[in-house]
């Protein structure tokens, strides 16, 4: 069994659920995840890559925590991504957030810098540490760090 635990920092929504059991992803739970990780600015829902959930499960397991991930940003519509690109530094034009393959998080009760180190040690996908904003970006793209 693999589970997820999320608290969305912008909407206050929470989800703790088993998303994989008996050798299969649980479609109903994946739909709940898609909804919680939607673009909260536009309310647009998009499929979240199950491999991203697996990455988060492994990250939480490796740090030895059962705390919820605090979600800063997950799926972003193209409109939201463009708005953020114009108003912020470090937002990619072709962000993996627009594909449901990236998430920005912190883990309750765990130092964010250390979370980034552990995420990099998994050697899976991209990992960005944003110290000033106190979050870690992880995605299911090619392995890279910033």
Q: Where do the protein language model's features map onto the residues?
A:
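Intrinsically disordered, low-complexity
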Residues: 1-31, 142
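Catalytic cores and adjacent binding grooves of peptidoglycan-active enzymes
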Residues: 2-7, 87-146
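Loop/turn elements at helix/coil->beta-strand transitions in domains of secreted/extracellular proteins
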Residues: 13, 65-69, 123-126
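Active-site acidic/histidine clusters and adjacent loop/turn architecture
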Residues: 21-72
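Acidic helix-start/capping segments at beta-turn-to-alpha-helix junctions
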Residues: 68-82
